[in-house]
From Swiss-Prot:
Signal peptide (residue range): none
Any one GO molecular function term: ATP hydrolysis activity
Membrane topology: Peripheral membrane protein
Organism (species): Methanosarcina acetivorans (strain ATCC 35395 / DSM 2834 / JCM 12185 / C2A)
Functional summary from the UniProt entry: Probably part of an ABC transporter complex. Responsible for energy coupling to the transport system.
Claim: Transport is one of the keywords in the record: yes
A single GO cellular-component term on record: ATP-binding cassette (ABC) transporter complex
The protein's name: Putative ABC transporter ATP-binding protein MA_1418
Binding residue positions for ATP 2: G294, E295, N296, G297, S298, G299, K300, T301
Residue numbers binding ATP 1: G36, H37, S38, A39, A40, G41, K42, T43
Entry's EC annotation: 7.-.-.-
Family: Belongs to the ABC transporter superfamily.
Chain ranges of the ABC transporter domain: 2-242, 262-494
Superkingdom per UniProt: Archaea
Amino acid sequence: MIELRNFSYTYGTAAIPALKNINLEIRKGELLLVTGHSAAGKTTLALAMAGILHHEIGGKIEGNISFQSRDVKEFDGIKELSRHIGVVFDDAESQLIFTTVEEEIFSGLENRGHPEKEMVRRSKEAMDFCAISHLNNRAPHMLSGGQKQKVALAATLALDTEVLILDEATAELDSQAVRKVFSVLKRLKDAGKTIIIIDHNIEDFLEIGDRVVLLEKGEIKAIKSPSEFTSKSSDLTSTNLTSTSALQTDLPLSRTAEQPIISVKNLTQRYGEILALDNIDLEIYPGELVAILGENGSGKTTLVKHFNGLLRPYSGKVTVKGLETSTTPINELVKHTGLVFQNPDNMLFEDTVEAEINFGLNNIGVKGPEAVGAILRSLELVNLNDKQKVFPRHLSRGERQRLAVACIIAMKPELIVLDEPTTGLDAEESDRMMQLMRKLQQEGHTIVMVTHNLQIVRDHVERVIRMESGKVVEDSANRKFSGKGSVKEESDYKGHVSKEIVSEEIVSEEIVSEESVSEECVRGGTCA
C-alpha cells in the first residue's frame, strides 16, 4: 500500500536528518502502530507517508516513497493524494478553519464533489461516530482541545479514504472518547481500511494492531508484533516508553498555611444559555500539588482560566493571594499565577527558544545576567539546554510543550497552573515533568494541573478534584480518590470497548478560546 525505500529526510537547513534510511512497507488492511520518544521522527514519518514533505514542505529528500506502487512525486500534489490518504495531526487546531463544526466536516466532501444527500449522510455518520453531533453549529475554535481533536477526526473519517494516519490524534481525549476511537478503528480495520497510528501511548491500541514500529532518533530501531513488543520489556522500558515510577498513592497533603492562595466562592460561568461552571466552591493552599480531572468539556480549563484573571466570574468570587480577580488587572494577577496553555503553540511567538523565555522575564523586570541565569536554569530543568538558538516551531510537539513550561517557571510565580502538561510527552518525559513539578513544589510553589492521566495522578499528586458538567463532584486526597470519571486508565481499554455512542456534555472547556487571549498577556505583557 505504502512503501518507503532507503528514505531519508532533512528539514531546510538543519544539520541532522529527521529520518534516516527508512525501509518500511505498510500492507493493505494493516493497522500499524508507530511509537518512539518526542523528536524521534514520528510526525515527520506521517508527513512523508502523506506526501506532504514532497509536495508542500520540501527539504532534502533521499530515497523514495510509493503509494499503490506509484511514486508520491508523480501525484498531482496533496489534492490528489488526499483522496486516498487521510491524516489527523496532533495539533487539531491547525486543521480547523471553518466557522462551524458542520461546515468543517462538509468542506472536504464538497471539495470532492459529492452530492448533498451523500454529504449529509457521511457527515452525520462521522459526527455520530465521534459523539459530536450536538456540536454541529458550534465554532471549532471555541471548543475544548479534546473536542477539537474529535472534529478533526470526524472531518477525516467522513472522507472515507483508503488509508487513515493518526498522529497523536487521541492525546487530548478523555478515556471514554479514546474507547470510542478504539471501537471506530476496529470497525474500520474490519472493513479493510489501512490505518497507521502514531502515538507515545500505543498500549491503548495494541489489541487491534498488527505490527509495532519503534523509532529512535529518526531510525527504525525495531519492527515487532504487538505480542513480541509487550513480552520483551526491553523494547518498552529500555526506551522509557512506559512509566517507571513507583506508585505513591499515600502522598501527604502539603498544606503549609491557613490562608488559601486561591479561593473560589459560588463561582458560576455562563455563555448565553450554556452553563460552563455551576456554583463552584474551592480553596487551594500554598504548597499543594493538585490535579483537576474530568471528561472533555467538563469545565476544567474554564475553571483554571479564572486563576489568573483570563476569565472573570459571571457570578461569585475568585481571589488570588487575596486579590479579587474581577477587579484586579490581569497584568498584576500574572505576577502570582503562571498558566501553561493546553496547546503550547498559543504561547510561542519569538524567533528563538531563549527569546521566548526572555520575553516574560523582561516584562517582570528581570534582565542582564539574572535573566541569562534564569533562562539557562529553566532550559536545564526541561532538558532543552541544547535548543537555545532553535526556532520554536522547529521543535517537536513534546519539546514545544516543555518550552512553554520553561517560559512560565523562569518567571517564578507562586502558583503554576498547567493545562494537560504531559500532552505530547512520552512516559519518561512525563515522569521527568512531574518530578520537576515536585521539585518546584518543594521550593515553595503551588502546582495545579489539568490532566486525563490517572497514572500521573497516582504517582505524583496529593489532592484530586474531579469535575462533571461544570461542577466539582469530588475533592479528596489522592489515597481516597475514587478513580471515577474520565481518566486514562489502562484497564479501561483491554477487551471491553462499548459499541454505543458515548454522549458528551455540551459544556465547553474553552468557550473563550486560547486564541482569543493575548499570548503576551500570560507572561506579563500587554493584555488585549
